[in-house]
Design a protein with these regions (language model features):
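Peripheral, non-catalytic segments that deliver or gate enzyme domains
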Residues: 1-119, 130-148, 175, 197-201, ...
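Conserved residues at the C-terminal ends of beta-strands
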Residues: 53, 126, 239
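Active-site-proximal cap/loop segments of hydrolase catalytic domains
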Residues: 154-357
């Protein structure tokens, strides 16, 4: 609480995370307390002061205090030395128009060493969730990709947080009784493809014949879905993905969640679960694919990856599969350092082979 009469809370806000307050009795409209093009990652309140951590697109997270007079002070400079040695490339914001007219917020990071007149391959990143967001923070994945010579694209398609309830609920299934939408692989797919084409049009240094796509969890789902519905990308990496929604409801540690999205249980509408599953479109997948998965993943069990790999091998498609023993769904964020480095090495070698050579 702010002073016993207010409640403070963070909210995703168009790529940012801001801090708001509202009356503890529920009256009044929420009031912005801490804003800006940045993401607040934690906070506490004492004596009318708010101590919080925040970072933005070119600065790592540090500690700040908002004093009682409304002034703000930075208390730590932990990230300055790293940023001085490895300056993050600032993103450029743009928007793309989806086929139904929806405006999708997106960003592009130019490759390190960018030179006017040159052409570069590009990687489209799709976030997990799906109810989360990309935005104004330093993300090591993007900086590593840019450092390897890629233009880096990312966006917040429908299903993401940070925009509106309607935006987040747009990918609920068409059979849902409340707020029916397109289902997974509907308008979200349209949005990420619109962003891809807009980036190629807007940034002439992107070589549209050398595009890659990658993502983890829901982002892995979307990667698998994309290559089952278009050959636009020259290479893809599907990581810790959901490839079979029906199987996910049987053996995941979040079994039951898809009732909220699909609009019915897997027992009542198995055909709808399969319609929205990449497994249904294996025969349409022709893009060279790298599959990355942790063997101890309980969120998206490794059988999700095995199903994809075995099917594509049976179809004699170009597919590679790397398994990480002893790792969970959190490999990229909390895995063993040796495995996190190995993952980057495998990922970059794969895309270099297909997009840089």
């Amino acid at each position: 609480a702010w002073d016993g009469t207010d409640v403070l809370f963070p909210i995703d806000d168009g790529g940012n995370v801001h801090l708001y307050r509202v009356g503890a009795d529920g009256t009044g409209k929420p009031e912005l307390v801490i804003g800006g093009d940045r993401q607040v990652t934690g906070f506490d309140v004492r004596g009318g002061r708010v101590v919080f951590t925040a970072g933005d697109a070119t600065h790592l997270t540090d500690v700040f205090v908002l004093d009682t007079d409304g002034s703000e002070r930075r208390l730590t400079t932990h990230g300055d030395r790293f940023v001085a040695l490895h300056p993050p490339v600032a993103p450029e914001r743009f928007t793309a128009t989806s086929p139904d007219g929806a405006e999708v917020e997106a960003w592009l990071i130019r490759p390190v060493g960018f030179a006017e007149g040159g052409t570069y391959p590009a990687l489209l990143n799709v976030h997990g969730g799906p109810f989360t967001q990309y935005g104004n923070r330093v993300f090591d994945e993007f900086q590593v990709q840019a450092g390897a010579g890629y233009a880096v694209m990312y966006c917040n398609p429908r299903g993401s947080s940070g925009y509106s309830e309607a935006w987040g609920r747009a990918i609920r299934g068409p059979i849902a009784e409340v707020d029916p939408g397109s289902g997974w692989g509907g308008v979200d797919y349209d949005d990420v493809m619109a962003v891809t084409e807009e980036a190629v049009r807007r940034f002439p240094f992107i070589d549209g014949s050398r595009l890659g796509v990658l993502g983890g969890s829901y982002g892995g789902y979307m990667t698998s879905w994309i290559i089952g519905h278009t050959n636009r990308f020259k290479a893809a990496c599907s990581e810790r993905a959901v490839n079979n929604l029906l199987a996910e409801e049987h053996n995941s540690d979040i079994a039951g969640i898809f009732k909220m999205y699909v609009g019915a249980t897997h027992l009542d509408a198995p055909e709808e679960y399969l319609r929205q599953s990449p497994v249904t479109y294996f025969r349409d997948m022709h893009t060279p694919l790298l599959i990355l998965h942790s063997e101890d993943d309980l969120r998206c069990p490794i059988s999700q990856a095995e199903e994809l790999f075995v099917a594509l091998r049976m179809l004699k498609r170009d597919v590679e599969f790397v398994r990480f023993p002893g790792e969970s769904h959190e490999l990229t964020r909390a895995g063993a350092p040796k495995h996190r480095v190995m993952r980057f090495d495998v990922l970059l070698e794969f895309f270099a082979r297909h997009l840089l050579s």
